[in-house]
Amino acid sequence: MRPTPTFCTLLLSAALATAADGGKPNDPGKPVTFDARTANSGNWSEARTWDGGRKPRAGDFVQVRTGHVVTYDVESNDALRMVHVAGTLTFSREKSTLLDVGLLKIEPGETTTEDGFNCHEAAPALPTGGVVPALEIGTPSSPIPAGVKAIIRLRHFKGTNPETLPAVIACGGRWDVHGAPMSRTWLKLAAPARAGDTRVTLEQAVPDWHTGGRVIVTTGDLQGPEAGASFRSKSGRSKPVGTEERLITAVDGAVLTLDRPLKKAHRGDGLMRCEVANLSRNVVVESATPAGVRGHTMYHHGSSGGISYAEFRHLGKEDVLGKYPIHFHLVRDTMRGSGVLGASIWDSHNRWVTVHGTDHLLVRDCVGYQSHGHGFFLEDATEQWNVLDRNLAVQAFVSVPLPKQVLSYDPNDGAGFWWANGRNTLTRNVACENDRYGFHFQITKSPAFDPVLRVRGPDGKTAPQDVRTLPFLRFEDNEAHGDGLFGFRFGDEVHGSVSGDREHPFIAKNLRVWESHYAIRPNVRFFLLDGLRVKNAAFGIYHPNFDAHVYRDIEFDAVTAEPINGGHDEDSRPDGDFTYDRLTFKNCRLDRDPLVQITLAATRPGVAGHFRGVSVADSKSAGGVVDFGGGPRSNRTDNAVSYYFHDTGRGTVTRVAGVKTLDPVKHADYRGIDGWTGRDARAAEVKAVAFPQLLAPVDDLPPATLVTGIRVEAGKRVVSGVSHDNGEIATVTVNGTSAKITAQHAGVADWVVTLDATADGHYTATTIDRAGNVELIPHKFREPSSP
């Protein structure tokens, strides 16, 4: 009888299961004995590459030895127990490949252990003049080309530790993983997509998106908060999900044809435009059994390499600390200029990209889709000088705190972006349909955590610093829509505990929030919000910790509950003055609360709020423009708060206060203004009240430079990089040669320079900003050696 294809498939599956489930017991502290070792450089598929001509077999421990360069040129379902790369293992760029493996470890030395988390306490030193061990699944200058696939499939072996294996671990080696470049990995819709449509139009052509690719079309809806509910399917209390997955069947310029009609409408005009993101890449790292034991990847201190245009799917170990799809673990600045570019990370059981104890990384153009716990995550509050630019975060789900996590106060409750040290740059990112927060900056002091940490300052010196006093390096042009609770939340519940100062406030610029419950909650002291557009939300600026707060160019469109809340916590007692300049209300129709909530008493005498350039269009409320809200009210009248509206008439200022704080005789001229003041507020013209300047930001922070690449071209060295600053970049030099700035937005500048090679291969890149601040920690780097 001739075997049927189905019968053959069953036999193959059984054989693979036997290979993966049997074998030697795991002892992570004991050096492994290799079954197959390289004898010299060559192709993986050739017997002459291996000791004794014995090629690797299913279940083997395999070693690519120091000094050997091996090309991986097979597409094999034989699952290897471990591959130790002490030389160079480079994947073919000419044919598709598959490596099925339990542990892939890049580490110098002739011996290693089967540990999927820790490296040697002291990594073996390279011999003098030795080449760093390298796993190359493409390189930045020579990625795996379109049309060729490279897949790493991480498989768990019976008897190995399910908390640490399977894994890819870089222990002082170089791990490069680079797929075919894409001009954009996600884009906004250029026109609305209706339910039933099979075609969507993007804002620009996507010639490098291909048929068969998996895409998501993000939600344009808001489900609103619901205690205990999640966008995660089978969560017990699942909320309706608006984001839809489809496959591409045709690409015509900016128009995609999808394999199935859309079930929901997706917005595509004005402020409210949904995103379409491509999840597919030609280089893939995945778990062999997503429903079983999943894999993870790690870069350790002293490693090198980076990731671009690769797909990390079905990874991350649920509820296990440190086992994430992409994890930079206590790297500090030993991988400066590295990072993750254009990757997709989806169906993760534990975050997307984790930056832990690491500085000077670039995470750009990445797509994160479905994560248990926070998605793009900076772990321990010491991370600084990192750039997160133009990433998309969709569906970070509520999880639980991880065992022994560094910051015990973090509930891990589903933020697209989560960080605890302000000295990082976040620009052009979008968060959508995350369970609790689009963006959550959270830092607090607790019995289990002291925020005074040893961190490196701009001068290069490391010293104790209360990280609650470190303002945002740059937070600009970010957007949130459809998130379960907050678009943006900053700071801590404790009044004034997270604080800048008058010259160094926390600054957020040009934020956009739509289809949101709470748009923004700023619980920081000394705060500047310069540009906010909110459309279709219940609450605008919610529970602000007013104390030296400055709001400029704020627009509320169809905010229906509380556009401006009276203050922090239920007492709504401001701690200090605040100002609003150029404040617009459009289409805000409120049933109960006013457009601007006021409060009776502050925590100290003399506190005032100042408003200028207020515009009200097609908006109304039963509570008027200015009044008390409908929530709990304090009866305290000590430390009365004044609200001044400037330029309400030609050169006039109107003071508004609560009725309970006004003396009937002294304030006899105070009266209600029809359509302006509500039932419990009164107003009168006052003189000699100037609009205050509460903040005077000073740019005395040097910029930071990330060298992201160096390549040889016509005998010259072409060096490229990114510099970022809280102001604007003026110049970048490499070894004294001026670089050309090719793009600049929101304090982030891309640059390139061509120069002669140096005799010793050493280079120094330095940036100066427009305020004249010179970088004191320039990026010093050495041209990598060739294998």
Regions found by a protein language model. Give the residues of each.
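The right-handed parallel beta-helix/beta-solenoid scaffold, focusing on the short coil/turn
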Residues: F34, D60-V62, H68, S76, ...
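Acidic Gly/Asp/Thr-rich repetitive segments characteristic of extracellular carbohydrate-active
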Residues: F34-T66, E203-R214
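Right-handed parallel beta-helix
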Residues: W50, P145-G147, I151-N161, E226-A227, R281, A291-H300, G305-H314, R336-H349, ...
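Extracellular beta-helix/beta-solenoid repeat scaffolds
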Residues: G59-K188, P207-D208, I216-P225, R232-A250, ...
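Short glycine/acidic-rich loop motifs that flank beta-strands on beta-rich extracellular proteins
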Residues: T90-K95, E110-T111, T289-H296, G316-Y324, ...
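Short edge beta-strand/loop segments characteristic of extracellular beta-sandwich folds
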Residues: T201-E203, I216-T218, V718-H724
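Ser/Thr-rich low-complexity repeats and stalk/linker segments
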Residues: P697-P787
